[in-house]
Amino acid sequence: MDFDVVSRRLARLRALMQEKKTDAFVLLVLERLNSENCHYISGFRGSSAALIIDGEEARLITDGRYRTQAAKQSPFSLTVQADLPLPAYVAKAVTEKGWRTVAFEAEKVSHGLFEAVLRPAPTRWVDGSAFIPSLRRSKDDMEAGAIRAAAAIARKAYDLALERVKPGMTEVEFESLALSEIKRWGGEKG
């Protein structure tokens, strides 16, 4: 993803954080859960990460497997996780920075994780579950272009698959044809 796109999205997130009076925003990706929001705001596509964003810095924390990938995919400052689990890094950063109000995606964090790791940090945690989805509702130029390209691929794939439909063919067989054409013309499985 283009780093300029990430920078514009980050600026919009920071404006929202200021509007909601939060000092920082935390996003966790654990075993791929929430990876779509992480990719949207940082460009990073790994299965394990934490993002910590305040008014001056955007930090990506991930384990050593993703060091090279993270540096290529995201302009965020990189911390390689070594001696602590990701949520503990978040709690440590919040404590060190002294932020008073931190937004996090409560809908994506288990109650047990929150109680064990995040709550003890000396801050007021607020639900920021709607932050990224509210940004995603308004499409930027890159997203609009991707939607147009996907529609063109889907139309072409559908038309080509329709040409191969035969009496007695099952829906599963047609789906297989359509997906094959989508991949052939550059589409991805979503």
What kind of region is each of these model predictions?
Residues M1-T95, A152:
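N-terminal accessory/capping or targeting/presequence segment of soluble
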Residues D4-L10, P85-G190:
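Flexible, acidic/His-enriched mid-domain "rim/lid" segments that flank
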